[in-house]
Amino acid sequence: MAATLILEPAGRCCWDEPLRIAVRGLAPEQPVTLRTSLRDEEGALFRAHARYRADARDELDLERAPALGGSFAGLQPMGLLWALEPEKALVRLVKRDVRTPFAVELEVLDGHDTEPGRLLCLAQNKRDFLRPGVRREPVRAGPVRAALFLPPDEGPFPGIIDLFGSSRGLCEYRASLLAGHGFAVLALAYFRFEDLPEDLNDVHLEYFEEAVDFMLQHPKVKGPSIALLGFSKGGDLCLSMASFLKGITATVLINACVANTVAPLHYKDMIIPKLVDDLGKVKITKSGFLTFMDTWSNPLEEHNHQSLVPLEKAQVPFLFIVGMDDQSWKSEFYAQIASERLQAHGKERPQIICYPETGHCIDPPYFPPSRASVHAVLGEAIFYGGEPKAHSKAQVDAWQQIQTFFHKHLNGKKSVKHSKI
C-alpha cells in the first residue's frame, strides 16, 4: 500500500489552529523524514524537517511519535511549523496580506539520510488568516489609518484596538486571527503608513483617542467601552491610552515598558518625555547581533520619573505577558514596577504571566519564534532572545490567556483558564 499523508483539518484551516499530521501505509518501524516549507509574500523560503520512525502498525502519528532529530527533537506535534527557519538568515516570518493564506508544503521521504531519500507522499495545508465569514474593512476615518476585522454574524461584538511596536506600519495578522474568536479588532497604524509620519519623533495621544471614538461609534462594536492589546512600543502606548482616555475597559500588554519610550508623548497641554536611552550601551552578541537590553535607563531613577506612564490613573484591569528572556528590554522588571505602583495606589493587582526562555517577539501560535531579525526601521540585525521550543509553547499559552482575559472583561465570562506554564 502506498504511503499517504493525513492532515486534520484536511486541506486548509486557520493559522492559529493546530494541525494533526499522520502518515499511513508505511512499513513497520520504517524510518522516514518529514519536511515542511512555505514562501512568504516576498518569496522568502522557510523550511523545517524532522526524522521519525513508523510504529509496528505501519503508521506514524505526530501526536504520539517523538521526532528523533532534525530541526527539533521530542514530542512536538506542531514542530514542523514552529521550527520553520528562513533559507536566508535574519528574515522574520510575518503575514503582510491577511486576505491570502500561507501554503505549507509537506513531504514524506524514505530514510534518515542526510541526502533526501525517495519521496513517498506529499500534501499541502493552506493556513488562512481570515476565518470563514470574518470581514476586513479598511479604515480611513479622519486621521485614523487602520484595518477593522469583524466576526461573522450581525453583532455587535466586543471591541479591541491592536498596536504593534516600532518596526512596522500597519500590521494586521494578529488582529485578523483574533477576530476569528468573536472580537471586533482594529489593527491601528501610527507611523510609516500612507500619510502618517515616517518616523516616531513625536506621538500625539489625540490620534489614538480618535481611534477609540471610531470604535465606540461603530455599529458593529459593542459599547460602552473597548479593550487594548499592545506589543513592545505599542504596549506603552496602550498604557498611556488606558491612563488618560475614556472608554477603555481592559488592557493586555506583551513585553511592554512602564515608561513612555522612543518619542515624547503629547496630550492636550501635557508632554511625557521619552525614557532616557544610551545607544552607546548597545551590545553585540557573539553572532554579531545587536541587543538593546542595557540601553534603557531605569525608569525608577529620579531623572526618569516624568517618563513613567501614570498607570495608577487607569480604571481597568491589566494583563502583562512577559518573556523572561526578552533581550530588547527588561519586561519582567517593568511588569513588577507596574504591579507595585498599582497596588501602592489601592488598585487591583495586575495579572502577570511570565514565560521562561521566551524572548521579545511573542506572536500568535505556530509562528516560528523570531530570535533575531533585521529591524524594519533600524535596518540592523537585532537579537530578541528566546529558546525556540519554549518560546513556541509560550505563544500557544499566551494566545489562550489573552482571549480568556478579553472574554472575561468584555463579555463578563468569569471562567479563567490558568496558564499551563
Curated annotation (Swiss-Prot):
Pathway: Lipid metabolism; fatty acid metabolism
InterPro entries linked to this entry: AB_hydrolase_fold (IPR029058), Acyl-CoA_thioEstase_long-chain (IPR016662), BAAT_C (IPR014940), Thio_Ohase/aa_AcTrfase (IPR006862), Thio_Ohase/BAAT_N (IPR042490)
Family: Belongs to the C/M/P thioester hydrolase family.
Protein's organism: Homo sapiens
A single GO cellular-component term on record: cytosol
Catalysed reactions, semicolon-separated: pristanoyl-CoA + H2O = 2,6,10,14-tetramethylpentadecanoate + CoA + H(+); phytanoyl-CoA + H2O = 3,7,11,15-tetramethylhexadecanoate + CoA + H(+)
Motif (Peroxisome targeting signal): 419-421
PANTHER family (alphabetical): ACYL-COENZYME A THIOESTERASE 6, ACYL-COENZYME A THIOESTERASE-RELATED
Gene3D superfamilies: Acyl-CoA thioester hydrolase/BAAT N-terminal domain, alpha/beta hydrolase
Active site, renumbered: 232 (charge relay system), 326 (charge relay system), 360 (charge relay system)
EC id: 3.1.2.-
GO biological process, one term: acyl-CoA metabolic process
Keywords from the named record: Cytoplasm, Hydrolase, Peroxisome, Serine esterase
A GO term for molecular function: fatty acyl-CoA hydrolase activity
Protein name per UniProt: Acyl-coenzyme A thioesterase 6
Gene for this chain: ACOT6
SUPFAM superfamilies referenced in this protein's UniProt entry, alphabetically: alpha/beta-Hydrolases (SSF53474)
